[in-house]
């Protein structure tokens, strides 16, 4: 906790570091709710604008990432003119525009004080993450978290989020960065780090969010292969032990058995993924999104308008068992979300923006081998895995996690 108090004291005493102080509490805003997440981005955007116009700091204009983001945001602004409900799309597009200020204020702060940023800021993030981490373990053991919150959904964990079952998203959003922090500053404790990684895998599994567990398992496996190759034999034994433990847990708990065996078995019993999707609610979402895309192939129906369009009877498809449950705020898959809401125009630009950003970041990582950048690359890449369910790209909580990891990923790119 001394690290946390030292961070607060050092940052508050220096007026120029107000933005650093605000950034240092980033994970906390996700625990407090969407209002605080939005305020976080807005305040940092205003600080960024102040620096641009009052201090005439415009170095970011030479950064290719800036123009990539501008290109992406400009495509969203164009989309508003073709949106079926422009007033519904506008706030989400403006929120994405505000993210620009956050990214480059974040990058400027990290570049100017990289050692302080990594040790103090990421250290504080890691402390907050660990508090949530242990709270999740507490709930797994006792059935309620330290505040008495319980999950209304069997086999899922609530933690500090109470009735918002997003513990898995939060875990995924900050887990790789926290792991990077421990590897950078506590590398001498190799056995403890290996044990921590294995416990993280176990906790991610027990949170009960299948999609986030799949993403985390893929991500941590890649992380180990890249940065922990010398310990691969230990990890292999650990993974095998976890597999046996997972099997025991699944078959001793009806909730986990239902989520990880019964529901997954349906994919194989259906003979194909296509048949499985016709039986599932996700399939109904995906099919409706695809039909929306076919009706509006160039510009889609507009950002955040999937919900307004799919309620129409024309999107009912009786080949999909749960077609009457197709309505949702988003299609639960980022590719279908962009295709249905921004059409080919927006989808192609989105892919260009994301893939170019990942390419530039990977190119830099290969040269400098920074674990924090690797953590950002992994999260952003995992966010665009096809078919695996995901949160809405334009909703506050998942978007916040995405842009924070995106900022980490691109902030290490050297000119």
Placement of each model-derived feature along the sequence:
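Transmembrane signal-anchor hairpin modules in multi-pass inner-membrane enzymes, especially those
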Residues: 1-91, 108-123, 181-191, 233-235, ...
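Loop-to-helix entry and N-terminal half of a specific, functionally important transmembrane alpha helix
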Residues: 15-26, 67-68, 72, 329-333, ...
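Alpha-helical transmembrane segments of multi-pass inner-membrane proteins
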Residues: 22-27, 118-152, 161-230, 249-252, ...
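Transmembrane-embedded, aromatic-rich helix segments that form part
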Residues: 38-43, 101-102, 169-173, 198, ...
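Transmembrane alpha-helices of multi-pass inner-membrane enzymes
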Residues: 43-49, 220-221, 350-353, 376-388, ...
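Hydrophobic transmembrane alpha-helices and their immediate junctions
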Residues: 49, 126, 189, 221-225, ...
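A membrane-periplasm/extracellular boundary helix in multi-pass inner-membrane enzymes
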Residues: 134, 227-274, 285-295, 303, ...
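Long extracytoplasmic/lumenal interhelical loops at the membrane interface
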Residues: 273-287, 291-295, 299-342
């Amino acid at each position: 906790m001394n690290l946390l108090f030292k961070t607060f004291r050092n940052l508050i005493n220096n007026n120029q570091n107000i933005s650093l102080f605000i950034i240092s509490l980033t994970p906390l805003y996700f625990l407090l709710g969407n209002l605080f997440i939005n305020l976080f981005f807005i305040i940092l955007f205003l600080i960024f604008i102040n620096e641009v116009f009052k201090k005439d700091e415009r170095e970011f204009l030479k950064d290719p990432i800036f123009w990539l983001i501008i290109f992406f945001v400009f495509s969203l602004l164009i989309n508003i003119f073709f949106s079926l409900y422009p007033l519904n799309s506008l706030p989400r597009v403006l929120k994405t525009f505000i993210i620009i200020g956050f990214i480059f204020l974040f990058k400027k702060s990290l570049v100017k004080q990289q050692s302080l940023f990594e040790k103090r800021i990421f250290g504080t993030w890691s402390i907050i993450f660990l508090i949530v981490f242990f709270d999740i373990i507490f709930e797994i053991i006792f059935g309620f978290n330290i505040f008495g919150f319980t999950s209304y959904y069997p086999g899922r964990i609530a933690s500090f989020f109470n009735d918002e079952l997003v513990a898995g998203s939060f875990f995924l959003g900050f887990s790789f960065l926290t792991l990077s922090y421990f590897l950078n500053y506590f590398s001498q404790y190799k056995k403890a780090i290996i044990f921590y990684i294995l416990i993280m895998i176990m906790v991610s599994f027990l949170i009960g969010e299948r999609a986030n567990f799949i993403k985390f398992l893929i991500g941590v496996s890649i992380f180990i292969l890249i940065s922990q190759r010398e310990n691969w034999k230990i990890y292999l034994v650990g993974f095998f032990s976890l597999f046996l433990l997972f099997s025991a847990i699944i078959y001793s708990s009806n909730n986990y058995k239902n989520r990880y065996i019964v529901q997954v078995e349906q994919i194989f019993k259906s003979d194909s993924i296509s048949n499985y999707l016709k039986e599932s609610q996700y399939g109904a979402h995906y099919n409706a999104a695809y039909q929306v895309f076919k009706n509006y192939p160039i510009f889609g129906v507009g950002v955040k308008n999937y919900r307004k369009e799919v309620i129409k009877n024309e999107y009912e498809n009786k080949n999909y068992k749960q077609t009457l449950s197709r309505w949702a705020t988003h299609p639960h898959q980022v590719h279908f979300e962009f295709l249905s809401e921004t059409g080919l125009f927006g989808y192609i630009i989105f892919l260009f923006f994301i893939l170019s950003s990942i390419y530039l970041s990977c190119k830099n990582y290969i040269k400098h081998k920074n674990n924090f950048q690797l953590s950002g690359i992994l999260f952003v890449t995992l966010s665009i895995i096809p078919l695996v369910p995901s949160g809405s790209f334009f909703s506050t909580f998942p978007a916040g996690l995405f842009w924070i990891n995106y900022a980490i990923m691109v902030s290490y790119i050297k000119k």
